[in-house]
Amino acid sequence: MTDLILKNAELQMKETIDAYVIHLRQIRTGKASGAILDKVMVNYYGSLMPLNQISQITTPEPNLIIIKPYDRNVITEAVGAIHKADLGLNPVSDATLIRIPIAPLTEDVRKNLVKKVHKELEGYKIRIRNIRRDAIDEIKKIENISKDLISDNEDQIQQITDKFIKQLDDLTKEKEKELMTI
């Protein structure tokens, strides 16, 4: 029974790490990356669709994103959606594609992004700790379980928690390094 609780907690923590990785990919670093457009939703014939599902997104140069919509009629909607997403991007469109030049980030913007990443890190650490707390509470609710077994499981959960917190810290350091590199 406790093994199932431990495995479930570990799985939830892994899902939290995966969500953090996705979140970090969407933070602009001064290099062109199609991932920063993942959350852009475009009105496509009456329904909202992710931009990356209705177009091909490429980065032919380190400071340029090219978007080729599969349907040319959606170009103006896509440009509007990119502006509305408030990503600090200035798309330029022509008849068949959208170009987004990526300007280098200033020192102040880089520092603010690092602060934002650290703030987000704390939120994800809290999620991991809440998973730990819930798992410990579940174990304590089990009837006829010895205090030694509870203590052993708490130690195991703490080790798992420490491992995932370290992963979060490592991912953050990597992103911080990427942000501060010009």
Curated annotation (Swiss-Prot):
Gene3D superfamilies tied to this protein: 3.30.1360.40, Ribosome-recycling factor
Superkingdom as given in the UniProt entry: Bacteria
GO molecular function: ribosomal large subunit binding
Keywords attached to this entry: Cytoplasm, Protein biosynthesis
GO biological process terms held by the UniProt record: translational termination
GO cellular-component term (any): cytoplasm
Cell compartments where the protein resides: Cytoplasm
Signal peptide positions on this chain: none
Major localization listed first in the record, in broad terms: cytoplasm
CDD domains: RRF (cd00520)
Summary of the function given for this chain in its UniProt record: Responsible for the release of ribosomes from messenger RNA at the termination of protein biosynthesis. May increase the efficiency of translation by recycling ribosomes from one round of translation to another.
PANTHER family: MITOCHONDRIAL RIBOSOME RECYCLING FACTOR PSEUDO 1 (PTHR20982:SF3), RIBOSOME RECYCLING FACTOR (PTHR20982)
Protein known as: Ribosome-recycling factor
